[in-house]
């Protein structure tokens, strides 16, 4: 007896089931799910896989997204504790790890998360040996280094979300002050994602007009308008949001989807993301810090050589030394 499906549909060919644009998100906490929904709403993948260790939560999140399929353009959403569900991913986004507690610095999380990465990364590599890895878990610069070491991937394929969000926060606050949309407010925050990030005051502009040229005191202590406060707010903003709602999610999710779009669509846009920076700015160790990078289908193909003031360069170097001090003690 022919089934209803057979009566309705005449099959012409057996299709091979390898996805062309698959994205995996590891970790379905607040950040992972914000990444997932942002990616789904930008139509970046033909398959989305979710992985976590908490099976009930994982299945619930998957079902909840699947029930929205009518309103999305991603035909397959899968999940599992076993990494076989991640096979053939183009991009794997790692958000899993211990969460930052109120008042806790990102660097404090480090050894807890290294141990988690020792399990995750080899499993990802096993099933998607040609993927790009996008690291979001904190402290992101150190964990990007850890993922690079464990994976054995070339450095172009291991990317940290880095200062993409810090720069977005900076441009939002700049826009609020000037009454201009953040897209038209240009400014870069580089270095460590977190407390020692470096705002590049010389690069701040609207429509190519340098703010530093108009206002030479910009970013200095003697600035009457105290633009330094804008960067201070960027540094404090995550702590404030965590204090108020317990975690951050939406902005980082949108920021990650922005990076995923450049990678999946080979856009070659420039983003401040964490990459291996050894040999630049007098840095001699294997550290990952954010500099402006061209992102496309191969991950980071190029980076932009930013001219820094001696003070900015010294701050970057100091960040690198701090990170290396922690990295060289890590057990993995």
UniProtKB/Swiss-Prot annotation:
Interconverts simultaneously and stereospecifically pyruvate and lactate with concomitant interconversion of NADH and NAD(+). Pathway: Fermentation; pyruvate fermentation to lactate; (S)-lactate from pyruvate: step 1/1. GO terms for biological process: lactate metabolic process. GO terms for molecular function: L-lactate dehydrogenase activity. The modification N6-acetyllysine is found at residues 5, 14, 57, 81, 118, 126, 224, 232, 243, 318. ISGylated. It comes from the Eukaryota. There is a cross-link at residue 57 (Glycyl lysine isopeptide (Lys-Gly) (interchain with G-Cter in SUMO2)). InterPro entries: L-lactate/malate_DH (IPR001557), L-lactate_DH (IPR011304), L-lactate_DH_AS (IPR018177), Lactate/malate_DH_C (IPR022383), Lactate/malate_DH_N (IPR001236), Lactate_DH/Glyco_Ohase_4_C (IPR015955), NAD(P)-bd_dom_sf (IPR036291). The lineage of its organism: Eukaryota, Metazoa, Chordata, Craniata, Vertebrata. The modification Phosphothreonine is found at residues 18, 309, 322. It catalyses: (S)-lactate + NAD(+) = pyruvate + NADH + H(+). Keywords: Acetylation, Cytoplasm, Isopeptide bond, NAD, Oxidoreductase, Phosphoprotein, Ubl conjugation. Its main location: cytoplasm. One of its GO terms (cellular component) is cytoplasm. It is found in: Cytoplasm. Belongs to the LDH/MDH superfamily. LDH family. The active site is at residue 193. This is L-lactate dehydrogenase A chain. The modification N6-succinyllysine is found at residues 5, 118, 318. The modification Phosphotyrosine is found at residue 239.
């Amino acid at each position: 007896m022919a089934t209803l499906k057979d009566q309705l549909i005449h099959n012409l060919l057996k299709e091979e089931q390898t996805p062309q644009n698959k994205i995996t998100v590891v970790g379905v906490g607040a950040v992972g799910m914000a990444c997932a929904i942002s990616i789904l709403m930008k139509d970046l993948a033909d398959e989305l896989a979710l992985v976590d260790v908490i099976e009930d939560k994982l299945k619930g999140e998957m079902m909840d997204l699947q029930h929205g399929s009518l309103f999305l353009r991603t035909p397959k959403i899968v999940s599992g504790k076993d990494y076989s569900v991640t096979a053939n991913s183009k991009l794997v986004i790692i958000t899993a790890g211990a969460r930052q507690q109120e008042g806790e610095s990102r660097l404090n999380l480090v050894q807890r998360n290294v141990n988690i990465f020792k399990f995750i990364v080899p499993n990802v590599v096993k099933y998607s040996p040609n993927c790009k890895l996008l690291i979001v878990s904190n402290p992101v610069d150190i964990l990007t280094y850890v993922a690079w070491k464990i994976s054995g991937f070339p450095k172009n394929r291991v990317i940290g979300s880095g200062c993409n969000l810090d720069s977005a926060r900076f441009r939002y606050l700049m826009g609020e002050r000037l009454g201009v949309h953040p897209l038209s407010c240009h400014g870069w925050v580089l270095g460590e994602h977190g407390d020692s990030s470096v705002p590049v005051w010389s690069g701040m502009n609207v429509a190519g007009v340098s703010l530093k040229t108009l206002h030479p005191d910009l970013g200095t202590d003697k600035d009457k308008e105290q633009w330094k406060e804008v960067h201070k707010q960027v540094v404090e903003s995550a702590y404030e949001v965590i204090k108020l709602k317990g975690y951050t999610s939406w902005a980082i999710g949108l920021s990650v989807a922005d990076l995923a779009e450049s990678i999946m669509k080979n856009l070659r846009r420039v983003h401040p993301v964490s990459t291996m920076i050894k040999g630049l700015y007098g840095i001699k160790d294997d550290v990952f810090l954010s500099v402006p990078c061209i992102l496309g289908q191969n991950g980071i193909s190029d980076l932009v050589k930013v001219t820094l003031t001696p003070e900015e360069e010294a701050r970057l170097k100091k960040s690198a030394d701090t990170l290396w001090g922690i990295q060289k003690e890590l057990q993995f």
